[in-house]
Amino acid sequence: MGSDVRDMNALLPPVSTLSGNSSCSMPVSSSGQWAPVLDFPPGAPYSSLPPHSFIKQEPTWNPDPHEDQCLSAFTVHFSGQFTGTAGACRYGAFGAPTPSQATTGQARMFPNSPYLSNCLDNQQGMRNQGYSAVAFDGTPSYGHTPSHHTAQFTNHSFKHEDPMGQQTSLGEQQYSVPPPVYGCHTPTDSCTGSQALLLRTPYNSDNLYQMTSQLECMTWNQMNLGSSLKSHGTSYENDSHSTPMLYSCGGQYRIHTHGVFRGIQDVRRVPGVTPAIVRSSTEANEKRPFMCAYPGCNKRYFKLSHLQMHSRKHTGEKPYQCDFKDCERRFSRSDQLKRHQRRHTGIKPFQCKTCQRKFSRSDHLKTHTRTHTGEKPFSCRWPSCQKKFARSDELVRHHNMHQRNMTKLQLAL
């Protein structure tokens, strides 16, 4: 299966034919292409949504979305203000909408993108596809589900939850929520207070980072959902009371990740989501079991907290701010903030045992100590040069000298 990316049309499960001979089946395209999948007017409240969210269509995928190896679960917790409004987007049969469904005068961001049929309102057939659930608190009740439904989400504080069961606080970072893929006019009257996002993606661990652009905003309707994620369980369970009806939303959200998988423990970076954890059963006893999954970065760490701090280099998150007057500098790590604040206070807690000189940073003391011991751990690697230095910056300057001399020699020749 590799790391191919499915067309969202192939990811939606097949549904039975309804009265009126309408059908919601979505075929796979016959050739690979990039295609927009949104249908939103350019005006508020969607003006902040990125207009360039695309999903690669690959004909190499089998159109059957029910492959066992794809049934892994992944949840992304959203918190933030719900800005979607009923009637903001259009729905209809796939292709052009029927005249009764079309809204006159409404501009489409992507004129050629598909419409979503309202067949989900009446669909009663069992849908046997593994889903990934995404919840957000559009109202103060996080992950709320109406009382007449089976609870799909339980209340959670917004903390990072690593796949092995640890719960460690992770600084909140704002991202633009990926735009919904399809949308319809309004939810049912009985479900107006229950918004959620559903990631309709069967996948394996190889293509996991592709998924966030495939989010859909939904409300829960009393219909059948054959395989649903229940309370962050490790496998899918049948739930005959809850099936989502599409609904549109947008805005800025605070994103958290929580991996829940069948057979593997694997969370990889997805666009717009904080780089998370990669940890498989074969790595459980390794010295550094936590590996960064940001594309191109495979650094490993002994502790989960160290990986979380490292991840902020990729996200740019700086949750620690200096509280001194007129200083608004921010840092990604608490020790960096503490070290910075010593500039304001003048505190120098590190003292040389030989000469009693004090320093505000331990690395400065370590470098200074070499002046007493004569240690020179930094060696020049230039051919035929054996010089050593006590400080790394001295080695850099020395190396630059070699480079300048080489340049002059080349120009002379």
From Swiss-Prot:
GO molecular function: double-stranded methylated DNA binding; hemi-methylated DNA-binding; RNA binding; sequence-specific DNA binding; zinc ion binding
SUPFAM superfamilies the UniProt entry points to: beta-beta-alpha zinc fingers
This protein's UniProt keywords: Cytoplasm, Developmental protein, DNA-binding, Isopeptide bond, Metal-binding, Nucleus, Repeat, RNA-binding, Transcription, Transcription regulation, Tumor suppressor, Ubl conjugation, Wnt signaling pathway, Zinc, Zinc-finger
Function summary: Transcription factor required for development of the vascular component of the pronephric kidney, the glomus; may repress tubule-specific gene expression in the portion of the pronephros fated to form the glomus. Recognizes and binds to the DNA sequence 5'-GCG(T/G)GGGCG-3'. Inhibits Wnt-signaling during embryonic development.
Gene Ontology terms describing biological process: glomus development; negative regulation of transcription by RNA polymerase II; negative regulation of Wnt signaling pathway; pronephros development; Wnt signaling pathway
Site positions per UniProt: Important for interaction with target DNA: 388, 394
Region feature Important for interaction with target DNA, mapped onto this chain: 334-348, 360-368
UniProt keyword RNA-binding present: yes
Covalent link Glycyl lysine isopeptide (Lys-Gly) (interchain with G-Cter in SUMO), residues: 56, 159
Subcellular location: Nucleus; Cytoplasm; Nucleus speckle
Residue window of motif 9aaTAD: 218-226
Originating species: Xenopus tropicalis
Zn finger intervals (C2H2-type): 290-314, 320-344, 350-372, 378-402
Comment text on domains: Binds to DNA motifs with the sequence 5'-GCG(T/G)GGGCG-3' via its C2H2-type zinc fingers. Starting from the N-terminus, the second zinc finger binds to the 3'-GCG motif, the middle zinc finger interacts with the central TGG motif, and the C-terminal zinc finger binds to the 5'-GCG motif. Binds double-stranded target DNA, irrespective of the cytosine methylation status. Has reduced affinity for target DNA where the cytosines have been oxidized to 5-hydroxymethylcytosine, 5-formylcytosine or 5-carboxylcytosine. The 9aaTAD motif is a transactivation domain present in a large number of yeast and animal transcription factors.
One Pfam family per UniProt: zf-C2H2
This protein's name: Wilms tumor protein homolog
Superkingdom of source: Eukaryota
GO CC terms of this entry: cytoplasm; nuclear speck
